[in-house]
């Protein structure tokens, strides 16, 4: 019937949450992106980092958005500044929107976002000089515990999403795998070890439907091929690499394109749709790569 009766009133049916996800920005964020989000009106925006090379423009722009937002900074956001000042400046601008090593509950729409280690460059576990300057020495197990503690603090009634700059180790060791090293031979698994360990611990206590990350660009550097950007493991967790770089483009008809990844999930955490999308500046959906449900051959 589409709705359930409670007494004499009809309880409204809760619609799916619609999340827009901006992959590695690398300075490609401007007024057209803000206008696009106004046109699309998603329930929330997730940003996986590498906003620029340590500049304040994009963090300041993100902080102005009225849209519910969660962000984790990437390795480029340190700006090659070992003192950590560039990182601190952006953290201050983003404020509570930055959820690295922490929890950000978006109410509305009703989503718990746990941030992984910020400013990671992948490759197992390593803290940059900038990270040490800002956070002090943090060992691998300490990082795991920070991520898990944030997840334990999340409202259990909300669906949980892990937001990371680099994805976890364990998704494959070939260059074209979601976190495979593609810029140097031999290829190897370049995912984050602390994130992989945290995922295993979190899933002992609650469901984890989705892990969102970037860092490993979709276009492979050596072969020019395309990376696998979506994996669903045997326990049902989905891993989405959103790093379409460059995310501003032009199609063969001369139309300007803006890339966003798109996820739709229920309030109980069931993921209904995962896609990479390219929009026109007017908000029209011009191209879509559907990742889930997997299209039939």
Identify what each model region corresponds to.
Residues 1-70, 78-86, 296:
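N-terminal active-site segment of His-dependent metallophosphoesterases
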Residues 2, 7-15, 104-107, 201, ...:
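Binuclear metal-dependent phosphoesterase catalytic core
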Residues 11-14, 157-207:
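Active-site-proximal segments of metal-dependent phosphoesterases and phosphodiesterases across multiple
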Residues 16-26, 110-124, 161-165, 237-244, ...:
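Active-site-proximal beta-strand elements of phosphoester/diester hydrolases
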Residues 21-24, 45-50, 69-75, 98-101, ...:
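Active-site neighborhood of phospho(di)ester-bond hydrolases with catalytic His/Asp-centered motifs
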Residues 26-32, 52-57, 76-83, 105, ...:
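Active-site environment of divalent metal-dependent phosphoester hydrolases
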Residues 81-104:
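Glycine/small-residue-rich loop that forms an oxyanion/phosphate-binding "nest" at active or ligand-binding sites
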Residues 108-159, 185-191:
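Binuclear metal-dependent hydrolase catalytic cores centered on His/Asp/Glu-rich metal-binding motifs
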């Amino acid at each position: 019937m589409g709705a359930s009766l409670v007494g004499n009133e009809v309880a409204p049916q809760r619609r799916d949450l619609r999340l827009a996800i901006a992959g590695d920005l690398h300075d490609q964020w401007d007024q057209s992106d803000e206008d696009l989000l106004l046109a699309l009106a998603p329930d929330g925006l997730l940003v996986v980092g590498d906003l620029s090379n340590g500049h304040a423009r994009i963090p300041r722009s993100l902080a102005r958005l009225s849209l519910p937002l969660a962000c984790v900074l990437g390795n480029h956001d340190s700006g090659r500044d070992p003192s950590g000042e560039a990182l601190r400046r952006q953290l201050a601008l983003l404020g509570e929107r930055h959820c690295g090593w922490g929890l950000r509950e978006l109410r509305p729409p009703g989503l718990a976002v746990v941030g992984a280690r910020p400013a990671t460059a992948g490759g197992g576990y390593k803290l940059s000089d900038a990270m040490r300057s800002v956070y002090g020495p943090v060992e691998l197990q300490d990082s795991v515990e920070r991520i898990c503690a944030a997840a334990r603090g999340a409202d259990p009634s909300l669906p949980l999403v892990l937001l990371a700059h680099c994805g976890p180790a364990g998704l494959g060791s070939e260059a074209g795998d979601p976190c495979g090293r593609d810029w140097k031979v031999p290829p190897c698994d370049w995912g984050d070890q602390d994130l992989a360990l945290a995922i295993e611990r979190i899933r002992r206590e609650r469901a984890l439907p989705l892990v969102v990350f970037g860092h490993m660009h979709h276009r492979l550097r050596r072969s020019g091929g395309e990376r696998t950007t979506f994996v669903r493991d045997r326990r049902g967790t989905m891993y989405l690499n959103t790093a379409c770089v460059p995310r501003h483009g032009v199609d063969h008809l001369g139309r300007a394109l803006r890339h966003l990844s798109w996820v739709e999930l229920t309030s109980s955490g069931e993921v209904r749709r995962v896609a990479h999308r390219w929009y026109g500046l007017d908000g029209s959906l011009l191209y879509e790569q559907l990742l889930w449900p997997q299209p039939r051959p």
